[in-house]
UniProtKB/Swiss-Prot annotation:
This is CTD nuclear envelope phosphatase 1B. Residues 58-225 form the FCP1 homology domain. It is found in: Endoplasmic reticulum membrane; Nucleus membrane. It is a single-pass membrane protein. One of its GO terms (cellular component) is nuclear membrane. The gene is ctdnep1b. InterPro entries: Dullard_phosphatase (IPR011948), FCP1_dom (IPR004274), HAD-like_sf (IPR036412), HAD_sf (IPR023214), TIM50 (IPR050365). CDD domains: HAD_FCP1-like. It comes from Danio rerio (Zebrafish). Pfam families: NIF.
């Protein structure tokens, strides 16, 4: 009887150890699969400007690209979420620990595919500005991680800079710059930029799809938007797209 119990205990211990090893293996595999997918996708080649294009850029103002965070560049969920939108077992890119209302909260943050490459490229074309409806203590920490000491996300606006209207946070781009002809906002929420639809580029909300290429797909358009004197002359033709998201 004693030997039988010892045998059962040994089997259970072996099963427990095997299960933990398998879970760790899946964790590492999923993390590396995301990296492999990003580097296998075709990148956007940055070509040298012709003399004519360079002269054109010298005759227009440098544009400002305003970037939303949640569901545009990243997705996060925090402790206590019963049904997170991320597939269980998917490792976060980083974890933030912040104190909200005197309570410590952990946020598990997932970066949208290609966001690092996207920021590296567009920072060469635009002055980048973060504008999020999130609280500053959270938004600032996320922006720090995305910036990664490159000093490309220095200007930041948070919930206190938004206007609350019927329960929605509206982003007033005039706080970013008084000349809206040179301001572009990239945001997954049309309600956030409803005061400035002619300055907006819509993007689908992202939660967990590892094959998403939305940020890469926007690079040709953002490349071209550097050249017109007024970005609204181009983006106003795209208003029908805002209803899709």
């Amino acid at each position: 009887m004693l030997k039988t119990r010892q045998c059962l205990l040994g089997v259970r211990t072996f099963h427990g150890v095997t299960s933990r090893i398998w879970s760790f293996f899946l964790y590492i595999l999923r993390k590396h699969i995301r990296t492999i997918i990003q580097y296998q996708t075709v990148r956007y080649d940055i070509l040298s400007l012709s003399p004519i294009s360079r002269n054109r850029l010298n005759n227009v103002k440098r544009k400002i690209l305003v970037l939303d965070l949640d569901e545009t560049l990243i997705h996060s969920h925090h402790d206590g979420v019963l049904r997170p939108t991320v597939r269980p077992g998917t490792p976060p890119d980083f974890i933030l620990k912040v104190v909200i209302d005197k309570h410590p909260v952990r946020f598990f943050v997932h970066k949208r595919p290609h966001v690092d490459f996207f920021l590296e490229v567009v920072s060469q074309w635009y002055e980048l500005v973060v504008f999020t409806a999130s609280m500053e203590i959270y938004g600032s920490a996320v922006a720090d991680k995305l910036d990664n000491n490159k000093a490309i996300l220095k200007r930041r606006y948070y919930r206190q800079h938004c206007t609350l209207d019927s329960g929605s946070y509206i982003k007033d781009l005039s706080v970013v710059h008084d000349d809206l002809s040179s301001v572009v906002i990239l945001d997954n929420s049309p309600g956030a930029y409803r005061s400035h639809p002619d300055n907006a580029i819509p993007i689908k909300s992202w939660f967990s799809d590892p094959s998403d290429t939305a940020l890469l797909n926007l690079l040709p358009m953002l490349d071209a938007l550097r050249f017109p004197a007024d970005v609204r002359s181009v983006l106003s033709r795209n208003l029908h797209q805002h209803r899709l998201w």
